[in-house]
């Protein structure tokens, strides 16, 4: 059971959640559905994010999924990541299983289009979300998981200060191969953002 404090300030009104490249924003299910549907149908992008869709997603089903994310449980906060330059949706990031008693939450994210990978969006999304988690939610620890084959993500997480906390052996079955899942975490005093 988690105690629910008063809601923190919205990133929409707080410039601390705007970087040089992206800003955290509220998800707009109507406006964001097309980009989200295209990402959901990209087997490479969804695989790296840990999703394995079993059906194609059209605009309407994407809108419905995004509406579910907006109405997420009290222990979840999801954001859209939009470019500062032209307000284009480039990804999504969220804090899940927020536990205010123990002071921890799980971080999950994806940069949607492969053309946007390696441009610094994911790094900045993570820094802004960690700033929100540690400064607004007053969390002590943020953790995440990734599949062991996602070496690019693990390198980024390590550069940002996440530390390896463990592995779930052969946790993921993908294309006939079993992969470990990697658990990484960061404590508030390890955050440099």
Segments from the language model and where they lie:
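GNAT-family acyltransferases
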Residues: 1-115, 178-179, 186-192
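Amphipathic alpha-helical recognition patches that constitute DNA-binding helices
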Residues: 23, 35, 106, 124, ...
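Solvent-exposed, non-membrane alpha-helical residues enriched in polar/charged side chains
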Residues: 37, 63, 67, 131-134, ...
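Structural motif
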Residues: 39, 132, 136-137, 159-160
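Conserved GNAT acetyl-CoA-binding A-motif
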Residues: 135-145
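Conserved catalytic-core motifs of GNAT/GCN5-like acyltransferases
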Residues: 143-146, 163-180
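Conserved active-site tyrosine of GNAT-family acetyltransferases
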Residues: 157, 162, 184
């Amino acid at each position: 059971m988690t105690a629910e404090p008063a809601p923190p300030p919205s990133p929409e009104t707080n410039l601390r959640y705007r970087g040089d490249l992206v800003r955290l924003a509220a998800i707009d299910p109507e406006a964001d559905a097309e980009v989200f549907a295209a990402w959901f149908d990209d087997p490479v992008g969804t695989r790296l994010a840990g999703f394995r869709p079993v059906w194609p997603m059209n605009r309407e089903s994407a809108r419905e999924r995004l509406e579910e994310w907006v109405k997420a449980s009290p222990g979840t906060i999801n954001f859209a990541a939009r470019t500062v330059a032209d307000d284009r949706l480039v990804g999504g990031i969220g804090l899940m299983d927020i536990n205010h008693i123990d002071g921890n939450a799980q971080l999950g994210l994806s940069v949607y289009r492969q053309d946007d990978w390696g441009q610094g969006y994911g790094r900045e999304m993570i820094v802004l979300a960690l700033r929100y988690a540690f400064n607004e939610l007053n969390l002590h620890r943020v953790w995440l998981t990734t599949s062991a084959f996602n070496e690019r993500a693990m390198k980024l997480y390590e550069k940002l200060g996440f530390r390896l906390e463990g592995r779930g052996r052969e946790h993921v079955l993908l294309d006939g191969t079993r992969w470990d899942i990697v658990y990484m975490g960061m404590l508030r005093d390890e955050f440099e953002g």
